[in-house]
């Protein structure tokens, strides 16, 4: 995909003045693991990290706001964005679609770090863009790409714990619960190919680990300037 200056979005790891662009942190997790809570905590503390707000066709949940939690759009608008190649990645999750727009991440003037809160399918597609890898079964696919996305997986402490969390969330029958648990099982198997894995058995402890990853990656990036 080309921009008005004829530069591929996929090639924009460097700003036009030659300085490294901001880092991309891609955080994913099974449903009910606390990913959104941890990401919100991070954004509250690190004001210089920009959140990439995803587009979705699902309905708003209580407390969510359009343009802040997600861009809530209908299926027709989502189809249009796919047709016009406006997404870096999009995925169908439990019958609802989620997508990350190119303009949210590959703005040529962006120097700030960006936080992507996306599912495992989304990370797979992001990896394909940056590393030409077909899927997460191909680790180290960004080995020669200094400015690749930093992938972080939030894991539940156990299968049983995740089951209890999803039951407490409510709003789903036993068939939906089993579907989410089976999906979580497959997602957790792919977590070994992420850069980092954080087990969320204690929210404050998990947040300290997430924050430490951000700080460490920023220091690593400074060495390349």
What are these model-predicted stretches?
Residues 56-114, 119-122:
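ATP-dependent small-molecule kinase phosphotransfer cores
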Residues 44-52:
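Post-Walker A helix-loop "phosphate-sensing" segment adjacent to the P-loop in P-loop NTPases
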Residues 33:
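ATP-binding Walker
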Residues 28-30:
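P-loop (Walker A) phosphate-binding loop of NTP-binding proteins
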Residues 36:
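Walker A/P-loop
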Residues 14-22:
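Phosphate-binding P-loop
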Residues 113-120, 135-168:
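Conserved phosphate-donor/acceptor-positioning beta-strand/loop module used by diverse small-molecule
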Residues 2-8, 12, 164-172, 179, ...:
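NTP-dependent small-molecule kinase module
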């Amino acid at each position: 995909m080309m921009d008005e200056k004829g530069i591929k979005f996929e090639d924009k790891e460097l700003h036009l003045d030659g300085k490294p662009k901001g880092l991309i942190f891609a955080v994913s997790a099974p449903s009910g693991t606390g990913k959104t809570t941890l990401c919100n905590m991070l954004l509250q503390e690190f004001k210089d990290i920009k959140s990439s707000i995803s587009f979705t066709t699902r309905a708003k949940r209580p407390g969510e706001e359009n343009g802040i939690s997600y861009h809530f759009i209908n299926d027709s608008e989502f189809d249009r964005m796919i047709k016009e190649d406006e997404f870096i990645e999009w995925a169908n999750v439990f019958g609802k679609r989620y997508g990350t727009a190119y303009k949210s991440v590959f703005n040529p003037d962006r120097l700030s770090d960006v936080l992507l809160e996306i599912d495992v399918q989304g990370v797979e597609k992001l990896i394909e863009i940056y590393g030409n890898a077909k899927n997460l079964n191909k680790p180290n696919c960004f080995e020669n790409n200094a400015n690749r996305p930093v992938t972080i997986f939030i894991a539940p402490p156990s299968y049983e714990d995740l089951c209890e969390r999803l039951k407490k969330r409510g709003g789903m029958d036993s068939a939906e619960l089993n579907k989410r648990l089976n999906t979580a099982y497959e997602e957790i198997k792919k977590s070994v190919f992420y850069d980092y894995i954080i087990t969320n058995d204690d929210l404050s402890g998990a947040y300290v680990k997430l924050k430490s990853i951000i700080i460490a990656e920023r220091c690593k990036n400074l060495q390349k300037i």
